[in-house]
């Protein structure tokens, strides 16, 4: 029984919601944004929650969520309070949540804004309270349902890593074959060049009656 509980606890830890609290200084609008990266699979549900102080303090915080392929999921200007964005990923990719804290004036440069960010992916992104109410599930049934989805996600992740390893191995083997053929070609070319030089020098020396 203890081993089962340990496994379930491990699964919950692996699929924990990514939560961060950090302080972002106000900068010029031309400065590069600060980005937090996570990884999502194709069709996976994602809930991004950003929270910052509601009061105006000479800083304007904007948030952009996009993936490594350039797909933009949301763009929020002047975040005040809590902003929640829900979407499904278009493909297996890295997901960037980028923050740009711009000072309204030169005097506001150097001010800071405290930001809370949470990124829930897959089973953790679902509203389990709503599911429990709509399907009239018991708390234990909700936990089992959640664990079942997490196990399925872990299985998909393992299959993805396996396929990725196969692709990388095939690429490595293909590269090794090309390097080997290139090395053989260079060696044959050097041998041919050496033979040609010997023949040429022999012919030259004979024409000069040296040999």
UniProtKB/Swiss-Prot annotation:
Membrane-crossing ranges are 181-201
User: Do the record's keywords include Transmembrane?
Assistant: yes
Bilayer topology reads:
Single-pass type I membrane protein
Keyword Membrane (UniProt) = yes
Q: Which GO terms describe its cellular component?
A: COPII-coated ER to Golgi transport vesicle; endoplasmic reticulum; endoplasmic reticulum membrane; endoplasmic reticulum-Golgi intermediate compartment; Golgi apparatus; Golgi membrane
What are the GOLD domain coordinates in residue numbering? 33-121
Q: Which UniProt keywords apply?
A: Endoplasmic reticulum, ER-Golgi transport, Golgi apparatus, Membrane, Protein transport, Signal, Transmembrane, Transmembrane helix, Transport
Predominant localisation class: endoplasmic reticulum
In the UniProt record, the signal sequence range is 1-19
The places in or outside the cell where this protein is found are: Endoplasmic reticulum membrane; Golgi apparatus membrane
Q: Per the record, what ranges lie on the membrane's Lumenal side?
A: 20-180
Instruction: Provide Cytoplasmic-side residue ranges.
Output: 202-211
State any GO BP term from the record. Golgi organization
- What the protein does? Constituent of COPII-coated endoplasmic reticulum-derived transport vesicles. Required for efficient transport of a subset of secretory proteins to the Golgi. Facilitates retrograde transport from the Golgi to the endoplasmic reticulum.
As for family, the record states:
Belongs to the EMP24/GP25L family.
The protein's name is Endoplasmic reticulum vesicle protein 25
Organism equals: Yarrowia lipolytica (strain CLIB 122 / E 150)
């Amino acid at each position: 029984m203890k081993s089962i509980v340990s496994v379930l606890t491990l699964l919950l830890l692996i699929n924990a919601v990514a939560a961060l609290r950090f302080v972002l200084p106000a900068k010029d609008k031309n400065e590069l944004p600060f980005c937090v990266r996570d990884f999502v699979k194709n069709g996976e549900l994602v809930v991004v929650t950003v929270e910052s102080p509601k009061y105006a303090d000479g800083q304007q915080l904007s948030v952009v969520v996009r993936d490594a392929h350039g797909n933009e999921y949301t763009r929020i200007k002047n975040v005040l309070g809590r902003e929640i964005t829900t979407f499904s990923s278009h493909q297996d990719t890295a997901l960037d949540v980028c923050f740009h804290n711009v000072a309204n004036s030169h005097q506001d440069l150097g001010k800071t804004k405290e930001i809370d960010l949470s990124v829930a992916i897959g089973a953790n992104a679902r509203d389990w309270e709503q599911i429990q109410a709509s399907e009239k599930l018991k708390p234990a049934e909700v936990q089992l349902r959640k664990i079942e989805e997490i196990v399925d996600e872990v299985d998909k992740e393992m299959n993805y890593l396996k396929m990725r390893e196969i692709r990388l191995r095939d690429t490595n083997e293909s590269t090794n074959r090309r390097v080997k053929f290139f090395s053989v070609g260079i060696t044959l070319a050097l041998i041919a060049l050496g033979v040609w030089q010997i023949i040429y020098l022999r012919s030259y020396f004979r024409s000069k009656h040296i040999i």
